Amino acid sequence: MQETRLVSCFGHNLSLSKQDFSEYYIFAVMKKIYHLGNCTTCQAIIKNTGIDKKGFVMQDIKFEKITPTQLDELKVMAGSYESLFSRRAMKYKELGLKDKKLEEKDYRKYILEEYTFLKRPVVIIKNKIFIGSEKKTVEALTEAVI
């Protein structure tokens, strides 16, 4: 019996063979954006870079939560969970996190518990990662998308 894996692609669950899963995984990692659909900053970046027309896998983190495996893969690319963590999230102040000394395990836990703690957008293109909406990041992303 052939081993299969269940994956989510554009809101649909797919059962893929091990080989197909490997190919899907490579594709998904090569061009993917983790974003928040109702975030106007994310919307502007998606529109201005043309990501929505360039074959990117688009994961709205509000409706398709980031998985522990996905977050761990992003951490490998980014270098730390802290670099993926948003201090702009309303819950950051509500939970009094600015007064606490957070460690890597804490950043990971909070991102997995609350989608707004993921700095966004996070874009993967081949082996490069672009995190957040700072001007220099968006400029580099725009160059990479072209």
Feature map (PLM): residue ranges:
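Local sequence-structure signature of Cys/Sec-based thiol-disulfide redox active-site neighborhoods
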Residues: 29-48, 59
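Short, well-ordered coil/turn elements that cap or connect secondary structure elements
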Residues: 51-53, 79
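Conserved beta-strand segments of alpha/beta enzyme cores
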Residues: 55-57
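Short, Lys/Arg-enriched N-terminal segments with co-localized hydrophobic residues
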Residues: 15-29
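Thiol/selenol-based redox catalytic cores and closely related redox-interacting motifs
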Residues: 61-141, 145-146
